[in-house]
Amino acid sequence: MITLLAVTRIFPTTSMGLTTRLLVPVACVLFLVGGRVQSQDAKFWNDQAKQTLQNALNRERTLNKNVAKNVVFFLGDGMGMSTVTAARIMKGQNMGNPGEETVLKWEEFPSVALSKTYSVDKQVGSSGSSATACFCGVKANDNMLGLDSRGRYGDCASSIGAAVDSFLILAHRAGKSTGFATTSRVTHATPAALYAHAPSRDWENDGDIPTEEAAKGCTDIGAQLVENGHVFDVVLGGGRRELTGTNQTDPEYPDEVGHRTDGRNIIEEWLSKKAANRTKYVWNLDAFSSVDPAETDALLGLFERGHMHFEADRADDEAGEPSIAEMTAKAIKILQKDPDGYFLVVEGLYNDGEGSDGMPYTTLNYADGPGGEIERDSYNAVGSRRNLTNVNTGGIDFKQSAIVPREDESHAGEDVAIYANGPMAHLFHGVHEQNYMAHVVRYAACLDYKEHCQMSSAPSRDGFNLWLILVTVFLSVRFWI
């Protein structure tokens, strides 16, 4: 099984459970920390190091070269190492410890590497080009979806002959069940790279494409969810407005209509491609909760007109929407019925977030973000940074300090971490290009590189599991049996 793990509330009871919000308070770690609650003498550190050494020695004797049957790829969009470090500390502090010594679940994975994150034409890549590299195995120009470097932004003609397929499409062709779940619109840049080929990530509905480019034959991302993405068995997320017309009323917001100008209802078209008696469409929490995986072969869930709510705001949604944990669990229960295995991609949006002298300050910081305006205003008013002594840095609306004022925090250009465990995890071993990840996935699961399949033992009855954790600025990969 391959799984990419986003650092969001995928598994709320584990170390991966973080509250996702654009300004996530999880990244706010105060410099002033209380007294240590456990002894950290020489024995503590020696025992810890000996155990780590023993784990390394054991790994050398037990390299896993089996075939991965299932793949689950969790992606936390925009989550850098500052946020990961903050998550580690916060987890420990919530357990009553100092926090720094805490180990997150993926930090137990035996293989660690780094991934570069640039796109072909930009030093700091966008979600679209990053997703194309990670899912399709080739680097792309910025803001491209499912195209190699021949594709140029906004140029329909340049996309002809430049299409590249994701490993989710390849998995379907190999006879596996496939799907994705996201807290973003299902036509947003990251999930769209799983099925769409577009010279602009912004072409989410037909009205987004300039008339002259549409005349050259390009179709919008929403339409491609039917043309290419109808092969998926599970599609969960937001974005109803990109799939319905301007003459179609939204079921949750009766004063709102869709954005499509061509009159198409992509939701109905997607459903028509499936066996009606085993296919379900849901748009609220009650309907989602009533879905019986044993009686469902295909599921389309669209829980918002646009992006789904921040985790911290989800309870305020009157119609209700499932958490990313609930979507993941439901998707796996539906897909795992396939004896040939399955591929699932899970994206957690809204991780681009907030990561505090007698005046406390946050020790993990971000180059840009909304907090930059607050710091600027403080210096202009009193000549120094803001004093966080009486500020609730764990509050839902706290804005983390930043250098450059921006409406939200952006992607960064530094390398990101890769953590791996399971079949072929040892192939992550140094500093890699971003597109290398897709090739390891395809190799481990025998989607191509067929010589591996011939040399490796066949998957067991229960299958081998490959877990991958990717976050635009942080990647972790897990493979296990």
Regions found by a protein language model. Name each.
Residues 40-54, 64-70, 79-136, 141, ...:
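A post-motif C-terminal structural segment
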Residues 17-57, 173:
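Short glycine- and acidic-rich boundary segments immediately preceding or forming the N-terminal edge
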Residues 453-467:
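C-terminal GPI-anchoring signal of eukaryotic secretory precursors
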Residues 163, 178-184, 450-455:
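Surface-exposed patches in mature extracellular/periplasmic domains of secreted proteins
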Residues 146-161:
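His/Cys-centered metal/cofactor-coordination and adjacent catalytic loops
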Residues 173, 178-181, 187-190:
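A conserved hydrophobic secondary-structure block that centers on an alpha-helix together
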Residues 3-9, 19-36, 467-480:
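Cleavable N-terminal signal peptides of Sec/SRP-targeted secreted and luminal proteins
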